Design a protein with these regions (language model features):
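Short, glycine/acidic-enriched loop or turn micro-motifs at the edges of active sites
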Residues: 27, 33, 62-64, 95, ...
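Histidine/acidic-residue-rich, glycine-tolerant segments that coordinate divalent metal ions
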Residues: 96-107, 111-182
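Metal-associated gating/positioning segment near the N- to mid-region
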Residues: 51-116
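Alpha-helix termination/capping residues and helix-transition junctions
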Residues: 2, 15, 39, 84, ...
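Divalent metal-coordination and catalytic microenvironments
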Residues: 8, 21, 26, 50, ...
Length: 182
């Protein structure tokens, strides 16, 4: 599907200018300067005159509580709300039930998100005192990082052993996102 978004105030690379954007499928294929409506064969045309056209937001720290705590929120409702607010991608935290601390739990979340999510997604894998080989061996293209709880929090994922912390800090090739207390 080829879409033309025309006449909007394009915000990109530190500048704002009136331009039109051509999107083919899910890829921006052209940016056309000026206020004239570009000619072409489009499946959909959006008049963005007077509106801002800008990149979507990436929310790198969400708690959608899915699976296991869905009385609070779930992937479908929260990703829908994210889309309405201009968030195009989210990274969900691992302190769910079950915790996302194994490759199997991570795979299950990806499979669930493929069915429920309205926007792009990824998931942090959580470190524990017992899963260092798993989190340091995870494919870095699958997850944005490793969540490390250094204080008690939802899900009781506290990593409190000095030997484990040393090994994690030494071996991790992914960014560590630490929840620090004390």
């Amino acid at each position: 599907m080829k879409t033309l978004v025309f006449g909007g105030k394009l915000v990109n690379e530190g500048a704002t200018r009136v331009a039109s954007v051509v999107v083919d499928g899910d890829t921006i294929t052209d940016i056309i300067e000026g206020t004239e409506t570009p000619r072409g064969d489009y499946d959909s045309i959006v008049d963005a005159t007077g509106c801002f056209v800008m990149p979507g937001v990436i929310d790198c720290h969400v708690h959608f509580r899915d699976p296991g705590l869905t009385e609070k929120a779930d992937m479908e409702t929260e990703s829908r709300a994210a889309a309405y607010g201009g968030v195009t991608t989210y990274f969900d935290m691992p302190n769910t039930k079950p915790q996302t601390t194994t490759e199997e739990a991570l795979n299950a979340k990806f499979e669930d998100a493929a069915k429920k999510s309205h926007v792009n997604y990824s998931f942090f894998i959580g470190a524990t005192n017992d899963n260092i080989d798993c989190v340091t061996g995870i494919d870095p293209h699958r997850v944005p990082g490793i969540k490390l709880f250094m204080g008690s929090s939802t899900g009781n994922m506290l990593v409190d052993r000095q030997d484990v912390l040393h090994e994690l800090f030494s071996k991790a090739t992914l960014p560590l996102m630490a929840h620090c207390e004390d």
